A protein has these predicted regions:
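Phosphate-ester processing/binding pockets and catalytic centers
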Residues: 1-199
Length: 199
């Protein structure tokens, strides 16, 4: 089994924000076939489908296609006060994700590429965790989103999660049965019952 990982960060209230990490889990032998099923989702001229750039009808098409792929998904969230610096929240989410994936024997993890310096921090982070006794077989690589269609899956899953907070539940409803694990980091704030929390 392999995991393909993307991130998202959104405001939740006037004073809080949420950092999310999403992973699509795909069996190794199915990866190429799933990539071929996803490729038609890329429009002419697009580098990749990207949730924030898509229309409502396109979002429906994308989530419907993903719901039929057979991939399973993990979503990890960290709710905090508003802060422009999110690398610490990313590390906390990745720690929870790595723990859950290792427990499921998913050790081959592809993260969407960011900048060289940010990717270097990801690699240093996993080395530090392994030096503390974490599973030594966990392996991360980075890849540009346009180069691997499997990275389009977590982008859409996190997009659907974020849309649900603004009352657009139809996308997440299509994907609900594919979300295997949904966790908050140990240091995450709990959602305020007064905010528009999704069901």
């Amino acid at each position: 089994m392999r995991a393909f990982v993307d991130e998202s960060s959104c405001l939740r209230t006037a004073s809080t924000q949420e950092y999310l990490i999403g992973a699509a889990i795909v069996s190794t032998e199915d990866c190429d076939a799933v990539r071929e099923e996803l490729r038609p989702l890329r429009l002419p001229g697009q580098i990749k489908p990207h949730w924030t750039d898509e229309s409502a009808s396109r979002r429906r098409s994308i989530t419907r296609a993903i719901s039929e792929l057979g991939s399973m998904h993990v979503v990890v969230a960290h709710l905090s006060g508003r802060n422009r610096k999110t690398e610490r929240y990313r590390r906390k989410c990745l720690e929870t994700l790595y723990y859950e994936l290792a427990a499921a024997d998913v050790l081959d993890i592809t993260l969407e590429r960011r900048s060289d310096s940010q990717d270097k921090k990801d690699r240093a982070h996993i080395v530090a965790l392994q030096n503390q006794g974490w599973n030594p077989h966990l392996r991360i690589t980075h890849c540009r989103g346009g180069d691997d269609p499997l990275l389009w899956i977590p982008d859409a899953v996190l997009g659907a999660v974020n849309a649900s907070y603004t009352g657009e539940h139809e996308y997440l409803d299509l994907l609900r049965d594919t979300i295997l694990i949904e966790k908050r980091t140990p240091e995450s704030l709990e959602p305020d019952s007064r905010q528009n929390e999704r069901p």
